[in-house]
């Protein structure tokens, strides 16, 4: 007796007859590159028996689904190893995440690097046992009995995917299932509440995983719940995939902006000031100034009106905008101002609550509303380097990329509904051109919309009709750009959908940069209007946008993108003059004055260090032009260029040297000068 299935693979389809007991392992078992399968579009284990008429497609280990399955299987192996080492541990959840996985544990002693090493050894032994992952459907009653000593699992049973972030890997789906890890002799080595799917056996994980770090966590992500310990790992489709990832991590560590910020004397985060707040040193402040100066100039060229607003405001403004109460958790607590009391302490004059500014849009609305507006003024674009403050939990602040105090290149455009599509497209093109100015050219778009679940719509304001119009407008504009568009359901701001530009840096990591949001709510809340051509008063549409995201975050990303070796036009110090000996100090000092008078950022190293050390120091500081002067140079009125790649161009007369450096600065090139390209830029 047989059944008919259709196998889809590598772009081809083939219908074939197979036995009624045929599983995915029978079809793909000899191919270790296949870790699971899709049956009628659903991800399932290879051990699953097929049904008549099934549409079957293999899941390759290197695919996104395949890697997620490998990583989730690795979490089970890790949790088994943890439970071997700590039998009384309470198991939390263990989902896959980008590039890896984690598992949360309660009732466990503090994890250390030595513990991670021991756990990896145990995981390798488990993998060597070639334990099978066996799916078992159970009832809620049976599951509670089996997992009676696991309080977090008991809490998850019956939730069917609701509750903790990542819990869907435990109990999502239509059935309650447990996965057993079964040894060759049939003995169950370990089990976990899980919906799967998993790789067929632990041998599929051989030489593909590593444990990476540990941290504190809270059950269900809520600080009111138990504190747990989270262990992270990574897993890949092959030994080579793991090695490549580990190399990327090493490169990312080398480029870490926090490390480079200290080494290059750009910025610091003094404990005396507090987490999430940065101090820019002279070189870092110059880098910041250069970025802001360029962005401001580009906005002026594009028809934006420069404005400025204060950094504190009465709380009522944020109630009008709707940020209170929707945004309250991410704002600093209010300050009570102007309260007066008599000698007995009785309040004689009520104070008012003031807030640090968390966003600029409410104040820009007040500028729009300050006088009557005509349709002839639209689109009206306001732009500000606004300084904002948001209360990020101390555990999530991260260098310059997640801060409590930051500056936004923030703009708000007021336009008619008819103008909105064209204005959005124009601004997206503007975003991309600014990012390209800084050497960021690899990007895609992400469209963030509100939750479709009616129960979760409460955190969003506005009518369904307005949301649909706004979302459709952004979607259509994004598609017209020809760029890749990735959906982000639930990621919208409370007042409207958002498009963000996701940028890939020099080592392939993705960063959110520019954003534009369609807002139909704030014009209503602030009673904004303009006089239309027919004499009626109409509500404008409001477009929020930021090109860099935040200046600080952009500096962090740019520092890592260039590994601290900024292009000539952005380098805080463009030239360092190094005399071969003390006898040439006056010569290089005089030339430094010439360069400085041309606006070139120059330093001289007149220290008592030996010449070789001076060169090493300049290279370590990533100065793009090291100019060396010795006897022959001084006699010829010249200098020698030493460049970042180690190449050298000797005997460049001073006038030509000035022209070369000035040209590299003014042309805003983002590549490094080489011996071959050094002079060519003058003739571009």
Swiss-Prot record:
The gene is thrS. Binds 1 zinc ion per subunit. This is Threonine--tRNA ligase. Its main location: cytoplasm. Zn(2+) binds at residues 361, 412, 544. It catalyses: tRNA(Thr) + L-threonine + ATP = L-threonyl-tRNA(Thr) + AMP + diphosphate + H(+). Residues 1-60 form the TGS domain. The keyword Membrane does not apply. GO terms for cellular component: cytoplasm. Gene3D superfamilies: 3.30.54.20, Anticodon-binding domain, Bira Bifunctional Protein, Domain 2, Threonyl-trna Synthetase, Chain A, domain 2. Belongs to the class-II aminoacyl-tRNA synthetase family. The keyword Protein transport does not apply. It is found in: Cytoplasm.
């Amino acid at each position: 007796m047989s059944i008919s299935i259709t196998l889809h693979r590598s772009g081809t389809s083939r219908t074939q007859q197979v036995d009624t007991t045929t599983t995915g392992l029978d079809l793909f078992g000899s191919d270790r590159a296949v870790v699971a399968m899709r049956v009628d579009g659903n991800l399932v284990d290879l051990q699953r028996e097929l049904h008549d008429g099934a549409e079957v497609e293999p899941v390759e280990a290197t695919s996104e689904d395949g890697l997620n399955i490998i990583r989730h299987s690795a979490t089970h192996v890790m949790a088994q190893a943890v439970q071997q080492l700590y039998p009384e541990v309470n198991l939390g959840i263990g989902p896959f995440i980008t590039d890896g996985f984690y598992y949360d544990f309660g009732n466990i002693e503090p994890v250390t690097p030595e513990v991670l090493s021991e756990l990896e050894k145990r995981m390798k032994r488990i993998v060597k046992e070639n334990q099978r992952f066996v799916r078992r459907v159970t009832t809620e009653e049976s599951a509670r009995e089996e997992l009676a000593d696991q309080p977090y699992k008991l809490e998850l049973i019956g939730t069917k995917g609701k509750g903790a972030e990542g819990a869907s890997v435990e109990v999502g789906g239509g059935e309650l299932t447990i996965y057993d890890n079964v040894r060759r002799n049939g003995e169950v080595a370990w089990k976990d509440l899980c919906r799967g799917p998993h790789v067929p056996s632990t041998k599929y994980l051989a030489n593909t995983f590593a444990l990476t770090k540990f941290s504190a966590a809270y059950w269900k992500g809520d600080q009111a719940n138990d504190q747990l310990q989270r262990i992270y790992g990574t897993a890949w489709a092959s030994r080579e995939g793991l090695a490549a990832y580990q190399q990327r991590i090493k490169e990312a560590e080398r480029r870490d902006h926090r490390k480079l910020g200290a080494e290059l004397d750009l910025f610091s985060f003094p404990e005396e000031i507090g987490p999430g707040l940065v101090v820019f040193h002279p070189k870092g402040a110059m880098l910041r100034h250069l970025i802001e100066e360029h962005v401001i100039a580009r906005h002026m060229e594009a028809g934006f009106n420069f404005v400025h607003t204060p950094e504190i405001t009465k709380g009522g403004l944020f109630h009008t905008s709707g940020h209170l109460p929707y945004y309250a958790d991410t704002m600093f607590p209010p300050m009570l101002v102007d309260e007066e009391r008599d000698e007995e302490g009785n309040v004689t004059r009520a104070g008012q609550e003031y807030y640090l500014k968390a966003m600029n849009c409410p104040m820009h609305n007040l500028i729009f509303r300050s006088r009557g507006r005509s349709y002839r003024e639209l689109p009206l674009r306001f732009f500000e380097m606004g300084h904002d403050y948001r209360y990020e939990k101390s555990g999530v602040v991260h260098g310059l990329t997640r801060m409590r105090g930051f500056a936004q290149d923030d703009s708000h455009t007021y336009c008619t509904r008819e103008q909105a599509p064209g204005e959005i497209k124009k601004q997206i093109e503007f975003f991309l051109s600014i990012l390209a100015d800084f050497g960021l050219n690899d990007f895609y778009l992400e469209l963030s919309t509100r939750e479709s679940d009616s129960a979760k719509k409460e955190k969003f304001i506005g009518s369904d009709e307005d949301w649909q119009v706004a979302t459709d407008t952004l979607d259509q504009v994004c598609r017209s750009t020809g760029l890749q568009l990735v959906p982000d359901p639930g990621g919208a701001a409370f007042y409207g959908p958002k498009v963000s530009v996701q940028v890939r840096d020099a080592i392939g990591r993705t960063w959110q940069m520019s954003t534009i949001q369609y807002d139909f709510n704030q014009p209503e809340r602030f009673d904004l209007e303009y006089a239309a051509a027919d004499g009626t008063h109409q509500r404008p549409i409001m477009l929020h946008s930021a090109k860099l995201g935040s200046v600080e975050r952009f500096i962090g990303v740019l520092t890592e993108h260039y590994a601290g070796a900024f292009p000539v036009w952005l380098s805080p110090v463009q030239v360092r003059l190094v005399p071969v000996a003390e006898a040439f100090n006056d010569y290089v000092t005089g030339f430094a004055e010439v360069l400085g008078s041309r606006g070139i950022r120059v330093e001289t190293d007149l220290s008592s260090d030996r010449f070789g050390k001076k060169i090493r120091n300049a290279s370590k500081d990533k100065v793009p032009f090291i100019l060396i002067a010795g006897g022959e140079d001084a006699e010829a009125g010249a200098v020698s260029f030493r460049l970042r790649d180690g190449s050298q161009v000797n005997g460049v007369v001073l006038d030509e040297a000035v022209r070369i450096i000035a040209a590299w600065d003014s042309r805003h090139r983002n590549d490094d000068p080489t011996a071959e390209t050094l002079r060519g830029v003058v003739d571009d």
